[in-house]
Regions:
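Cytosolic, long alpha-helical scaffolding segments
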Residues: 1-222
Length: 222
């Protein structure tokens, strides 16, 4: 049986989540985080540029993310059930992985939701101010995902504090965009779609916060 984790005698609680994964598992974890980051950036660009083909490619990319998540969930569950020689630290890493994967999958889903609206041409119907706010939300969303990736992939726990602050900016932008929607500068159907869009970006930030908290909690005291 292929081992996802080595059989070390001493637990290593401070290691990054994927630091001890073997070569069959680590690339998949790294790839998932990269795909989600690309999906969010691509969805925002497609929305603002009106590139419907790019939007459709982001939607298709979500299928790859879902497939990778399912593959890792199955592998992690198999290890927990069949590999009796895992030490405590490795078991905790696997359990943490099983907890963060749904957050990652949902983050990819949010990028897909944005891309679907881009494919329908929502971007061209936005007011200038709402467009500027959406552009900034996209930039902040990409930044917070990079920070979350650093925490999970590289174990840079110091980035967790920055994630909380970045999420606060996303929350503020969400409030600002919601206020803009009540100004009457856009039709009601467009305003409704933009309200959903703002919520998608805000929820994306929340998932990043949850990812960081799970990693920090894993390395914290029991």
């Amino acid at each position: 049986m292929n081992r996802l984790f080595g059989n070390r005698s001493e637990p290593d609680e401070e290691a990054p989540l994927v630091a001890t994964a073997d070569e069959a598992m680590r690339p998949q974890i790294v790839q998932i985080f990269a795909l989600v980051g690309e999906a969010m950036a691509g969805a925002t660009h497609a929305l603002l540029s009106g590139d419907r083909e790019l939007a459709k490619s982001v939607v298709d990319k979500d299928k790859a993310i879902d497939a990778l998540v399912n593959s890792l969930v199955n592998a992690a569950e198999l290890q927990l059930v069949e590999n009796e020689s895992l030490n405590i630290a490795d078991r905790r890493r696997l359990l943490t992985l099983l907890r963060i994967l749904p957050e990652v999958e949902r983050s990819g889903d949010l990028a897909e939701h944005i891309a679907r609206r881009a494919a329908r041409g929502l971007g061209v119907e936005m007011s200038p101010r709402s467009r500027g706010l959406v552009e900034r939300m996209g930039e902040v969303a990409s930044t917070i995902w990079r920070e979350a990736t650093d925490v999970i992939i590289d174990g840079k726990l110091e980035a967790a504090g920055a994630i909380e602050e970045i999420d606060d900016e996303l929350d503020d932008l969400h409030v600002s965009l919601t206020a803009e929607l009540t100004s009457g500068s856009m039709t009601l159907p467009v305003a409704v779609e933009l309200a959903l869009l703002a919520r998608f970006y805000e929820r994306f930030g929340d998932h990043c916060v949850n990812l960081a908290r799970r990693q920090v909690g894993r390395n914290g005291p029991d």
